[in-house]
């Protein structure tokens, strides 16, 4: 499915998926997440001009409507957000990680770890 804009929380997997798909976002970070990591995730994406952040305490129907209408009505900004989001995304991250693990494990081929007591 293709989306012009996502309105969502800012957990790590959500942010990563949006980046890989190049989907601009309005993030409403969950304020009670461990170590406030959702706010950190959202603010980073906002600092990269890939997203907008609305703190939950500021969220009203009018606020969200104004943000959505403003973004949907500004195709240049939405395209720039899409471009920035895509630049952040790592669509081949799993492949890169698998290759790195393969290289590391090759270094230890035949090595049997000694138990520690």
Residue ranges of each PLM-predicted region?
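Nucleotide-activated sugar donor-binding and catalytic core shared by glycosyltransferases
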Residues: 1-117
């Amino acid at each position: 499915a293709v989306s012009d804009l996502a309105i969502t929380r800012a957990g790590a997997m959500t942010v990563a998926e949006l980046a890989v798909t190049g989907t601009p976002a309005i993030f409403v970070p969950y304020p009670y997440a461990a170590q406030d990591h959702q706010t950190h995730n959202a603010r980073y994406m906002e600092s990269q001009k890939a997203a907008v952040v609305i703190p939950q305490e500021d969220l009203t129907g009018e606020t969200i409507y104004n943000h959505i209408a403003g973004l949907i009505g500004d195709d240049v900004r939405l395209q720039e957000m899409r471009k920035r989001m895509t630049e952040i995304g790592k669509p081949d991250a799993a492949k890169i990680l698998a290759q790195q693990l393969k290289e590391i494990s090759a270094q230890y081929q035949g090595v049997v770890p000694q138990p520690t007591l």
